[in-house]
């Protein structure tokens, strides 16, 4: 189901949602951090989704053990490096890794700007080692409020040339986009792209707000767009992409079952939608699973899956020249 003549991308992938269970175990031992289990087999139910969670907020608690072991900037650097190694193992040629430095820093009160620098270093070294092309998206964790998001924004701005885009993630219902208008004004002034988690827990009005008020060029998840025909028309006409995450939307109970997922309808409507993982370490999936298992289960035809793969590159925060070079590099293999 994956077209090997085309670049394989993952443009909605949380770095802090892809910390290996084995790494959690090792860092826990290294820093004498009490974990809920002492073997890999018994730890996995605590750090991976075994049964679907009742809602998004419940799902997000599964990420907590991964960041609780980030007791130093070296630990942050390690998990960033391993994220690139995992991407290479999955056959990804290009990945956009997004991360919330405030969330990663929280358990051990690490300097937020230091976390950003450590992630940049780890990703850079991983790209050199494994030959993967990567860009970084800064996340503001709306769940922690406006002031915490401001701190994250300042940390990103201190490294503005290494950050490609700004995102807003977390509790969409409790912390609407309207609270963060000034943050996104500064992001646009910095020349960054904008992608926003919207229409996952909240309705289509959240997507409209992300586009009109925050300047979103892409929407993370965006499943509730299916409820608003005018919105779907607008997304298609304006080529505002939807970063679909199939398995994730089932595990968060955002969508009841894969057969009911709106990705197929989005593609039929001419919306530029792509296939992505979200939090692969927590979900226990990889991009290959999403293409070969989840996408067919969601009713996508072989041609629709190929179109979603094409869309992944077209939606990427790359220049036209970078996209062309990536296509040529894959075609030459």
UniProtKB/Swiss-Prot annotation:
A GO CC annotation given for this chain: cytosol
Annotated substrate binding sites: 14, 16, 170, 279
Cofactor: Zn(2+)
Function: Catalyzes the hydrolytic deamination of adenosine and 2-deoxyadenosine.
Source species of the chain: Shigella flexneri
Top-level EC class: hydrolase
Name the UniProt record assigns to this protein: Adenosine deaminase
Family stated for the protein in its record: Belongs to the metallo-dependent hydrolases superfamily. Adenosine and AMP deaminases family. Adenosine deaminase subfamily.
GO function terms (MF aspect): 2'-deoxyadenosine deaminase activity; adenosine deaminase activity; zinc ion binding
Sites marked Important for catalytic activity: 221
The entry's keywords: Hydrolase, Metal-binding, Nucleotide metabolism, Zinc
């Amino acid at each position: 189901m994956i077209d090997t003549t085309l670049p394989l991308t993952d443009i909605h992938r949380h770095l802090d949602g892809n910390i290996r269970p084995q790494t959690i175990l090792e860092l826990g031992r290294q820093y004498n951090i009490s974990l809920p289990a002492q073997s890999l087999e018994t730890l996995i139910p605590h750090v991976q989704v075994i049964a679907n969670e009742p809602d998004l907020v419940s799902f997000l608690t599964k990420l907590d053990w991964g960041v609780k072991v980030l007791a130093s900037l070296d630990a942050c650097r390690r998990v960033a490096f391993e994220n690139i190694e995992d991407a290479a193992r999955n056959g990804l040629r290009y990945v956009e890794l997004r991360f919330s430095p405030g969330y990663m820093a929280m358990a051990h009160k690490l300097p937020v700007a230091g976390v950003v620098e450590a992630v940049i270093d780890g990703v850079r070294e991983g790209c050199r080692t494994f030959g993967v092309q990567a860009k970084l998206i800064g996340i503001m964790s709306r769940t922690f409020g406006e002031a915490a998001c401001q701190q994250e924004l300042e940390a990103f701005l201190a490294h503005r040339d290494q950050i490609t885009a700004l995102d807003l993630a977390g509790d969409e219902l409790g912390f609407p986009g309207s609270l963060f208008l000034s943050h996104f004004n500064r992001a646009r002034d910095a020349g960054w792209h904008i992608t926003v988690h919207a229409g996952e827990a909240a309705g289509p009005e959240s997507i409209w707000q992300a586009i009109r008020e925050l300047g979103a060029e892409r929407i993370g998840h965006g499943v509730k767009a299916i409820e608003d025909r005018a919105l779907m028309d607008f997304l298609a006409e304006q080529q505002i992409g939807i970063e679909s995450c199939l398995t994730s939307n089932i595990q968060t109970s955002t969508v009841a079952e894969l057969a009911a997922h709106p990705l197929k309808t989005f593609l039929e409507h001419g919306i530029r939608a792509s296939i992505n993982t979200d939090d692969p370490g927590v979900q226990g999936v990889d991009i290959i699973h999403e293409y070969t298992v989840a996408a067919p289960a969601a009713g996508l035809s072989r041609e629709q899956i190929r179109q979603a793969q094409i869309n992944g590159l077209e939606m990427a925060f790359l220049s036209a020249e970078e996209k062309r070079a990536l296509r040529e590099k894959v075609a030459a293999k």
